[in-house]
Amino acid sequence: SYLRMVDDLGDIPRGLAPHSLRAVPVDLLPELVQAGRDLLGDGFPMHIHISEQQREVEECMTSCGASPIDSLADTVELDAHWNLVHATHVTQSELGRITSAGARVVICPLTEAYLGDGIFPASDFVFRGGELAIGSDSNVRIDAVEELRMLEYSQRLQQQLRGCLATQDGLGGHLWSSTAEAGARSLAMNAGKLEVGAMADIVVLNAHAPPLQGPRGQRALDALVTAGSRENSADVYVGGRQRIKAGQQEGQELLGRQFAKVVGGLLND
């Protein structure tokens, strides 16, 4: 039945995601990777939560004799198909191993702040040529703009500098486009960019939203990341199909009532 579910995905890319070295013994990973190749062929994406909290690192050092990232890199062949989620407590030498292998880091700034995990050295990683994607980690607040703001502001707090992830063209446009493209690559999807042949995933901003009044071009995207939120999106298209129109999702009222019913039932229990 599981394989039928996989087949039902159609053209949606499939991957392998052992949760973490806390949940999956590191010496089992080569067998899992081979099973993935047998099922999916070559080139599928692999995701794993790693070095998210200091206690995880300490326990891995005790049980494996090495940190989670080093244990992973010593056991499997890291490459561009691997996506290391969080990697909060990465060392400088581990950053070098990740970038040399071409592996990707996926950080979840709002969740990591909520849990008090720590701060990933994003600006250092990007300076080394590392590729950074953004995930939500199923946090209770799903907002891509807030994730990017938390990413940039955490670096500012850590380094006591401004514009840590900005380029000479600004902050917002670079952050949005680079993480969108990296996120698409982390899922082996032809998305995250506007070009012929790519998925038509498009966000149309509300130019009348207060944070976007006045700024134009790249400055508008700077304003979005520093002062805006998901509420500043007017229309959203996924694969060319409009999902949000004028800030409203199709069937939003019904979904709201269903959500309230489910939450009410959980709280009453």
Where do the language-model regions lie?
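Divalent metal-coordination and catalytic microenvironments
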Residues: 16, 49, 84, 98, ...
